Swiss-Prot record:
It is found in: Cell membrane. Pathway: Cell wall biogenesis; peptidoglycan biosynthesis. Keywords: Cell cycle, Cell division, Cell membrane, Cell shape, Cell wall biogenesis/degradation, Glycosyltransferase, Membrane, Peptidoglycan synthesis, Transferase. The gene is murG. Its EC number is 2.4.1.227. This is UDP-N-acetylglucosamine--N-acetylmuramyl-(pentapeptide) pyrophosphoryl-undecaprenol N-acetylglucosamine transferase. GO terms for cellular component: plasma membrane. Gene3D superfamilies: Glycogen Phosphorylase B. GO terms for molecular function: UDP-N-acetyl-D-glucosamine:N-acetylmuramoyl-L-alanyl-D-glutamyl-meso-2,6-diaminopimelyl-D-alanyl-D-alanine-diphosphoundecaprenol 4-beta-N-acetylglucosaminlytransferase activity; undecaprenyldiphospho-muramoylpentapeptide beta-N-acetylglucosaminyltransferase activity. The keyword Membrane applies. It is an enzyme of class 2 (transferase). It comes from the Bacteria. InterPro entries: GlcNAc_MurG (IPR006009), Glyco_trans_28_C (IPR007235), GlycoTrans_28_N (IPR004276). The lineage of its organism: Bacteria, Bacillati, Actinomycetota, Actinomycetes, Bifidobacteriales.
Length: 393
């Protein structure tokens, strides 16, 4: 350690799924050890480009070095590019006097892992997905500590490495909400409902397919508006460019009078609240009795940490990665899993109203989700990173 002050380099980025956990751990490190010097290695094109400086951390950038997946011209160029970027990483780690490197996956992580290993710098890894990505699979060969959100990620740690399910380091707004609802969920619900323009005394279903929306989810739910509104009010976040179709389907099902927006001015105007996107998703989480959503790793972990029952509809692409994200909490009793192809208006009609009417079953889903969820992942991960920075390590 550098004269009693730990110098910690965090690596990762590209998507919010990599950047948000990184920043959560960075904040926890500073909370535990205010003297710690924390910097980040990322790319100049990922979300970290803006989010890291905005959070108050210095960002050192390298170019993306994705591993070749098939024989092509890039495969021929890869060795030279890898050598150039790892040399740049070595310079950064030397300049930053790094005591430990902690990686969160993404393009920037792989060259950092390889370089830190050659320099003898301890390595910690956080893997957020049920099936690990290529960068973290590489880093696991050399890591001293691996923190995961799921069991069975496919990572193969070296002999002697510590591996622990630590959970997902939560975004500040979500971490704050977990503490507040633990103290007084009803009060938090009332305050949040006032800001959204919804009734805190009526059940609420939150529907979201992410920032881009989910067409199949949008159509199945909006077409079932009349069935659902008999049991609950709805907040439907449609995704960009998809709100018109959703409103048309709702109108066809339940009439135009049920439609309204989101915000205090919408109170009492209708029970089907629509918007393309909601910046303060924590407000909707605070009011929700049931969430119908995709099964991204971040979404699943946040809903479990909040103890929210959910119907997960995995994105039907790749090797079914999203299904693997949702299966553990569903198997623990924290919700339902339905394939995208099966989510039809008929499925909604046959399953969701009965679930909303069964308050005991819904409450049990919530209890099981809460028991499965982990709310202090950022602190756990931060303590492991700081431990690796100690001279004895």
């Amino acid at each position: 350690m550098n004269q009693g002050t730990p110098h910690i380099v965090l690596a990762g980025g590209g998507t919010a799924g990599h950047v948000n956990p990184l920043l959560a751990v960075a904040g926890a490190i500073r909370d535990i050890e205010p003297t710690a010097q924390v910097t980040v290695i990322g790319t100049a094109v990922g979300l970290e480009k803006d989010l890291v400086p905005e959070a108050g951390y210095e960002l050192d950038t390298i170019e993306k070095v994705p591993f070749p997946r098939r024989p092509n011209l890039y495969m021929l160029r890869f060795p030279a590019k890898w050598k150039r970027e790892t040399a740049k990483v070595r310079s950064i780690l030397e300049t930053r006097h790094a005591d430990v490197v902690a990686g969160f996956g993404g393009y920037a992580s792989a060259p950092v892992y390889a370089t830190a290993h050659k320099m003898g710098i301890p390595i910690a890894i956080h893997e957020q997905n049920a099936r690990a990505g290529m960068a973290n699979k590489l880093g696991a060969r050399w890591a001293d500590f691996i923190g995961t959100v799921y069991e069975g990620t496919g990572l193969k740690p070296r002999a002697g490495a510590d591996v622990e399910r630590v959970g997902l380091p939560l975004r500040p707004a979500i971490a704050s909400l977990t503490k507040r609802i633990g103290d007084d969920r009803a009060a938090v619900r009332r305050e949040s409902a006032a800001q959204l323009g919804v009734d805190p005394n009526r059940p609420l279903v939150l529907v979201t397919g992410g920032s881009l929306g989910a067409q199949s989810l949008n159509r199945a739910i909006a077409s079932s508006a009349a069935d659902l509104l008999a049991h609950a009010q709805i907040i439907h976040l449609t995704g960009r460019g998809k709100i018109s179709e959703v409103r048309e389907l709702v109108t066809a099902s339940a009439g135009a009078d049920v439609l309204t927006g989101i915000g205090p001015e919408s109170a009492g105007q209708g029970d089907y609240h629509t918007a393309e996107y909601l910046e303060r998703i924590d407000l909707a989480f605070a009011c929700a009795d049931l969430v119908i959503c995709r099964a991204g790793a971040g979404s699943v972990s946040e809903l479990a940490a909040l103890g929210l029952p959910a119907i997960y509809v995995p994105l039907p692409i790749g090797n079914g990665e999203q299904r693997f994200n949702a299966e553990p909490v569903v198997n623990a009793g924290g919700g339902l899993l339905v394939a995208d192809k099966d989510l039809t208006p008929q499925w909604v009609h046959e399953h969701v109203p009965d679930l909303l009417a069964d308050h005991e079953r819904l409450a049990e889903f919530g209890r099981k989700a809460w028991e499965y969820g982990i709310r202090n992942a950022a602190e756990i991960m931060a303590r492991h990173v700081l431990q690796l920075a100690e001279p004895s390590k």
